[in-house]
Amino acid sequence: MKYDVAIIGGGAVGNYLANLLAGEFRVAVIEAKTSFGGKACTGIIGAENYEKLNLPREAVLNEFTGAVFYSRIQSFEIKRKTPQAYMVDRKALEKALAERAIKNGAEYYMGTRFLGFKDGKALVQRFSERFEIEADFYVGADGVSSKVAQEVGAKTEAEFLSGYEVEVVGDFKRKDFVEVWVNKDINDEFFMWVAPVNESLARIGTFGSYDALMRFLRLRLLKETQIVEIKAGNVGFGFRKPWAKGNVALLGDAALQIKPLTAGGIVYGMLCAHALRYSIRRGDLSIYEKLCGDIKKQIAFGLRVRKLFKALDQEKIEKLFEILSSREAINVIEKYADFDNHKKTITALVKHPRLLARALRVTPMLLRYLVM
C-alpha cells in the first residue's frame, strides 16, 4: 500500500492534518485505538482559534466568557462580553475531523499499532496481522510517548508530569466561568481547575498526583463519591529535537508542541499542522521547524514562566495575587488577554511600569525569567 503521506496517530491534531492534506494527497492515518477519544483532556480551546481553524461546531459542549482565579486566601475574576474559549467533546472533535478527512479521500487504519520503520516503510500490526504501509512522508502524531520520535532518534529535554481529571456532579451555576486555583499547600506542581460542562457537571483536574486532586475536591466542598468519570494521562513540558528528519516529521504532543502553563496542545499542534502541510507541498520537511518559529518562542517563554512558578513559595504567590487583583492589572488583562497566547498577556503586564515595579519588590526573579 503506497501513500503520499502516512500519519501515525489519529488524535485531534493528526486528524486535523489529515483533513488539511486529504483531497490533495493520498493520505493514510494509522490509529492504535479502536475508537476516538479517551485521553485525559479538559478540551478547552480559545474561541478565536477555534473559528480560525474551522473546527466543528457540533463538538462544542460549553462556552466560557471569563475566569475566576483563586489563591489560598484571595481571588479575582476576568470577564468579557463574548465567549473567550470553548469546551469540546474530545471524542466528537476527533471523530468529526476524521469524517471530514475520509470524505476527502483519506484512508483510516483503526486498531492498528505502529511497530517501527523497516526498509523505509511503516511496519504496523492490526490484531494478529502484520503488514507494511509505504509513503513518501511519515508524520508522527502519536502523543508524548511517541514511538515515531524514538524511531528517528529524537532527543528530549523535558519535564514530565502525570495528569488527573475527574468529572464531578455538583452545583456549577456560573457555567460560563472557569475556576483556576493556585495553592501550593495543596499541589506544588501545578494549578487546579474547575471547568463546568453544564450547571450540574464539571471537569476538575490537575497535574502532579491524584492525592492532590482529591485534596482539592475536599477544599472545593465536593466528595469523591460525586465523581462519575476518572481519566489520567501524561504531559511533557520542554523540547524534542528535531521536529523533522529525512522524510519523517513530528507533530502535536509527539513534538512537545504543548503550552507549559496550561498543558494544552491542540492549538499549537494544529497551527504547526499548517506549516507541515506547506512543507509537504514543497517536498521539503527541513523548512517545517523554522515555519513554526513563533510556536517555539511561545513554548520557550512558557517554560521560563513555569520555572518562575516552581521557584515561588505560596507567600510570594499571595503577594502577586494582590497585584493581579488590582483594578490596574485587571484592566491590562482584560484588554490584552489571549487564551492561546500567554506571552502576549504576560508581556503586557510586565511592560506596565507600576505593575512591574510592584512585582519586582515581591520577587526580583521576574527579571531573570520574564523581562528579556
Where are these regions (language model features)?
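A conserved beta-strand/loop capping segment in the N-terminal third of enzymes
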Residues: 47-96
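N-terminal Rossmann-fold NAD(P) dinucleotide-binding loop
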Residues: 14-15
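Glycine-rich FAD pyrophosphate-binding loop
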Residues: 6-8, 19-40
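Beta1/beta-strand and adjacent pyrophosphate-binding region of the FAD-binding site
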Residues: 1-11
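FAD/FMN-dependent oxidoreductases across multiple families
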Residues: 114, 207-279, 286-291
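C-terminal auxiliary extensions adjacent to catalytic cores
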Residues: 316-372
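Predominantly flavin-linked oxidoreductase catalytic cores and closely associated redox partners
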Residues: 10, 100-225, 256
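Active-site-proximal substrate-binding core of FAD-dependent oxidoreductases
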Residues: 278-318
